[in-house]
Amino acid sequence: MDKKLARIRRATRTRQKIKELGTTRLVINRTSRHIYAQIISPTGSEVLVAASSVEKVINQEFKYSGNKEAAAFVGKIIAERALKKGIIKVSFDRSGFQYHGRVQALADNAREAGLNF
């Protein structure tokens, strides 16, 4: 089993468990250059809030958007946008990525900004 397939299998298991809980989920996707975060409804049919390092606000702030500092800023922005919409409690879906580095920075700053997970 290769690395990508193993990550996808972990992500599928996590999503299934979160679906059983029936809560909104904070989904992370990571590429080598950017990081994306979305808060998805319990049914999975609509994106309630989104933020990514591709956005102009973040792109102008950082020289390179594929680092921990940019991920931390995305975490802060996603939490602020969620709180404006009245979303406080979410389940963290790291999409099979290891809880380390950019994923951890995003999660920690989202918690500091007021999201509970």
Swiss-Prot record:
<dbReference type="GO" id="GO:0022625">
    <property type="term" value="C:cytosolic large ribosomal subunit"/>
</dbReference>
<dbReference type="GO" id="GO:0003735">
    <property type="term" value="F:structural constituent of ribosome"/>
</dbReference>
<dbReference type="Pfam" id="PF00861">
    <property type="entry name" value="Ribosomal_L18p"/>
</dbReference>
<protein>
    <recommendedName>
        <fullName>Large ribosomal subunit protein uL18</fullName>
    </recommendedName>
</protein>
<comment type="function">
    <text>This is one of the proteins that bind and probably mediate the attachment of the 5S RNA into the large ribosomal subunit, where it forms part of the central protuberance.</text>
</comment>
<keyword id="KW-0699">rRNA-binding</keyword>
<comment type="subunit">
    <text>Part of the 50S ribosomal subunit; part of the 5S rRNA/L5/L18/L25 subcomplex. Contacts the 5S and 23S rRNAs.</text>
</comment>
<dbReference type="GO" id="GO:0008097">
    <property type="term" value="F:5S rRNA binding"/>
</dbReference>
<comment type="similarity">
    <text>Belongs to the universal ribosomal protein uL18 family.</text>
</comment>
<keyword id="KW-0689">Ribosomal protein</keyword>
<dbReference type="GO" id="GO:0006412">
    <property type="term" value="P:translation"/>
</dbReference>
<dbReference type="InterPro" id="IPR005484">
    <property type="entry name" value="Ribosomal_uL18_bac/euk"/>
</dbReference>
<keyword id="KW-0694">RNA-binding</keyword>
<dbReference type="InterPro" id="IPR004389">
    <property type="entry name" value="Ribosomal_uL18_bac-type"/>
</dbReference>
<keyword id="KW-0687">Ribonucleoprotein</keyword>
